[in-house]
Amino acid sequence: MNVKGKVILSMLVVSTVMVVFWEYINSPEGSFLWIYHSKNPEVGDSSTQKGWWFPSWFHDGTPSNQEEEDIDKEKRREKEQRKEDDEEELQLWDWFNPKKRPEVVTVTSWKAPVVWEGTYNKAILENYYAKQKITVGLTVFAVGRYIEHYLEEFITSANRYFMVGHKVIFYIMLDDISKMPLIELGPLRSFKVFEIKPEKRWQDISMMRMKTIGEHILAHIQHEVDFLFCMDVDQVFQDNFGVETLGQSVAQLQAWWYKADPDEFTYERRKESAAYIPFGEGDFYYHAAIFGGTPIQVLNITRECFKGILQDKKNDIEAEWHDESHLNKYFLLNKPSKILSPEYCWDFHIGLPSDIKIVKISWQTKHYNLVRNNV
């Protein structure tokens, strides 16, 4: 074949390839992909979010007519699905039986369930939420020496026990992202790592997380998950922490105080503080190590708590238990729709009384002299 023939043949081959690619990118399968990395985490900060996007080749970013039709079809399908889901909405008594645990408080005065082992029907819940195709987020903060002492075990155990069988996104907030451990996540699990500003005092770290969580919910989390939990890093999952914990707003009973009288609780008792709760008031003592709900409800929680923290700073006062004091004040005024028993956040230093059937999460040993920069 002469040179002219080779040129013509090459041009035909290139044209064919381009036509094939053009047909592919204008098909539904040619849409862009979002890649979550297990070993190479996405890195961001509190105001921006970076990711890796792989657009279809030769795509100018403008949807084709076919793509617009596909989007419209998908929207109609989702609308119909939501209508069906509303008709099949799971009722409390479909899955919850308080009589299974008569020795403990299982229903609050405002009719919210207190979830203990044995009170819920796991099969019904799993079947319901599997149809919903939910995504659950989990935020955790690790700064300074908390990273090396607690983070890897927390994430590894969460990977094993948190919302098994459902899509999960871990939102990991670090003051030094270079110390992020390499962790291989299981199926349906991904994580995003964000760098946060270091604080001089651990008390400020604890309180400022309310602001940071709220910022991230507004920036992206509200569009990424259906439910969100916020947890302390110095604890470890021991057993399945599943969909029985999901709700509009979820509070955690504090292990040391769940049997105490409200007047014994370590609420903030000074009237000058925004977290003030007078004697004679209060329902339960809630642990700030775990709280959650829908993204919008968690946003409300963090906003109101941070508002109280700022008010206290303005008045030159600091609540006794920092963000936890403000969280208890919030839940006094805005009752949680679901409460988790101490089984979901237990301290083995208490022992193991008969009403604690299965420990879902346990406290880690508190090495405050090692991990806090001001004790």
Curated annotation (Swiss-Prot):
Species the sequence originates in: Lemur catta
Active-site feature positions: E324
Record keywords, A-Z: Glycoprotein, Glycosyltransferase, Golgi apparatus, Manganese, Membrane, Metal-binding, Signal-anchor, Transferase, Transmembrane, Transmembrane helix
EC code(s) of this entry: 2.4.1.87
Regions of this protein lying in the Cytoplasmic compartment: 1-6
Cofactor details (free text): Binds 1 Mn(2+) ion per subunit.
Gene name tied to this protein: GGTA1
Bilayer topology term: Single-pass type II membrane protein
Localization: Golgi apparatus, Golgi stack membrane
Signal sequence, start to end: none
Residues in compartment: Lumenal: 26-375
Pfam families, per database record: Glyco_transf_6
Stretches with biased composition (Basic and acidic residues): 72-83
Binding site for substrate: 141-146, 232-234, 254-257, 266, 366-372
Record-given protein name: N-acetyllactosaminide alpha-1,3-galactosyltransferase
Biological role stated in the UniProt entry: Synthesizes the galactose-alpha(1,3)-galactose group by catalyzing the transfer of a galactose residue, with an alpha-1,3 linkage, on terminal lactosaminide (Gal-beta-1,4-GlcNAc-R) disaccharide borne by a glycoprotein or a glycolipid. Preferentially glycosylates proteins, can synthesize galactose-alpha(1,3)-galactose on glycoproteins but cannot synthesize the glycolipid called isogloboside 3 (iGb3).
Positions of Mn(2+) binding: D232, D234
UniProt keyword Cell division, yes or no: no
Sites where a glycan is attached: N300
Stated family: Belongs to the glycosyltransferase 6 family.
GO biological process: carbohydrate metabolic process; lipid glycosylation; protein glycosylation
Residue ranges of the region described as Disordered: 57-83
Pathway membership, UniProt: Protein modification; protein glycosylation
Cofactor needs: Mn(2+)
GO cellular component, one term: Golgi cisterna
GO MF annotations, alphabetized: metal ion binding; N-acetyllactosaminide 3-alpha-galactosyltransferase activity
